[in-house]
Amino acid sequence: MICAISGSTTEEPVISTKTGNVYEKRLIEKYIDTNGKEPTTGEPLGLSDLITVKIGKTVKPRPTTATSIPSMLQLFQNEWDSLMLETFTLKQQHETVRQELAHSMYQYDAACRVIARLVKERDAARSALANARNIVQQQQQQTNNNNNNNNNKDVEMSSASTPSSSEDNLLDSTIYKRIAEKSEELIKTRKERTHQSLAEPDAIKQFKVSANVETDCQIKSLEVNSQDNNLIAMGGINGNVYVYSRETNELCTAIKGTSSAPINKVLFAPNNTIVSAGSDAVIRVVKGGESPSKKTYTQYKSTYQFAHKASVTDISLHVLGDYIISSSLDKSLNMYDIVNGTHLTSFGQSQQLCYTSVAFHPDGMFFAAGTQNGVVKIFDLKSKVNSFNFQGLSTAVNCISFSENGYYLTAADNNTVKLFDLRKAATKNSPDIQTITLDNQQIKSINFDYSSQYLGVASSNQINLYSCKSKQKPPISSIHSIDSDCLDFKWARPNSNFFVTSSSSKNIVNIFSN
């Protein structure tokens, strides 16, 4: 009797009652324990379905091929050859299956890539369609406004330059190339920058009023000249701009008639230039002599003027020194060339939000703008897209300050300061890593020093000084507080060896140092 599984003569034969097949008892029992099925037909089969077959006890003669040692060796050789051929065939089949599986995986990966690209193109098409609708609406509105203006016989004349280009005009490619090259240069040099003469925290704790400057009005905005920190620009609520020299301890000049309304922000620019922004919606650029001395400051003359339609709340100087960005309550952000006196482009008009503060990133590739609803918006200079929003403040964003190393952004409303990590902006909706709340205080100004290690927060009745270390958690820790009312606060650059504040109750500017 031949076993249906092994194909050899059985020693203990059994018969399946369901199929009549003969099996070796030990083999079929193992198969049933493992699979529970008939080997040839796949039908359910149990041990009770097997019947033992009784055979005679006569000794079976050996086959003729196994009667001698040479014959047995030949038999073993044939069996070995068959085994090797079967193994080789199995290896070939395994390799074929592996290649087919790899090919299927590559096809699956390619299909996923195609799907991702199509989804991206779909989203871009939707965004382009939405932008096109906004542009068409703006053009229709502008056409209606032009028709109304043509019907009006009175023409308003102004010496200030009002932007005429629409928001969809991109920044000139030549200008953007300069900005990109400067950004790459700054990224390389920033890693090599050291601050050997930087004031230590213990020294800053000892800061006190070392000098004060009396003026004929309250000073709303301050700026320390980064090229010569002996010079301090002051913007008054009477519309005048003052320049003070620490070296001579006197006012170099008072540039009167700069504005007819309070100066909201004043900046130093290269080539002995001062830029001021007022509540009268006008930005003024004035320039003196070739060197910043008392003699040349008295020779300041108005060079250019730029106009918004409502109060200019803030301005920021680009790291190149040739361009500024301005924020206004007329729901626009304008970029100007202060060297040639031209309006370059506008941002954020489609957002329909009043902008209360603005600041360029130290690398100069994008800027942040604070809004009246407590949101800080990031705009890319090249694409002009609002690429990210920082949230968490409840009222208008009064002031913004970037750390010079480019890692952090601080923004403040009336009594809360938020510290955001720009490196995590792509991974979180609002990557704020620390919140500072000043109860019973109204925050007026915040300012990072040049080393990015100190942060000053000035409020209506206190100056709060903090250290900032990226390796500690939280990164900002308080090091000192000074009881003093403030309207503005600025660190000296680059060594942070003093800072200046303006009083909210007196016509005075205080200089704090050791």
UniProtKB/Swiss-Prot annotation:
Residues 1-70 form the U-box domain. Keywords: DNA damage, DNA repair, mRNA processing, mRNA splicing, Nucleus, Repeat, Spliceosome, Transferase, Ubl conjugation pathway, WD repeat. One of its GO terms (molecular function) is ubiquitin protein ligase activity. It is found in: Nucleus; Nucleus, Nucleoplasm. Its main location: nucleus. Gene3D superfamilies: YVTN repeat-like/Quinoprotein amine dehydrogenase, Zinc/RING finger domain, C3HC4 (zinc finger). InterPro entries: Apc4-like_WD40_dom, Pre-mRNA_splic_Prp19_cc, Prp19, RING-Ubox_PRP19, Ubox_domain, WD40/YVTN_repeat-like_dom_sf, WD40_repeat_dom_sf, WD40_rpt. The keyword Nucleus applies. It catalyses: S-ubiquitinyl-[E2 ubiquitin-conjugating enzyme]-L-cysteine + [acceptor protein]-L-lysine = [E2 ubiquitin-conjugating enzyme]-L-cysteine + N(6)-ubiquitinyl-[acceptor protein]-L-lysine. One of its GO terms (biological process) is RNA splicing, via transesterification reactions. Probable ubiquitin-protein ligase mainly involved in pre-mRNA splicing and DNA repair. Core component of the Prp19 complex/PRP19C/Nineteen complex/NTC which is part of the spliceosome and participates in its assembly, its remodeling and is required for its activity. This is Pre-mRNA-processing factor 19. It comes from Dictyostelium discoideum.
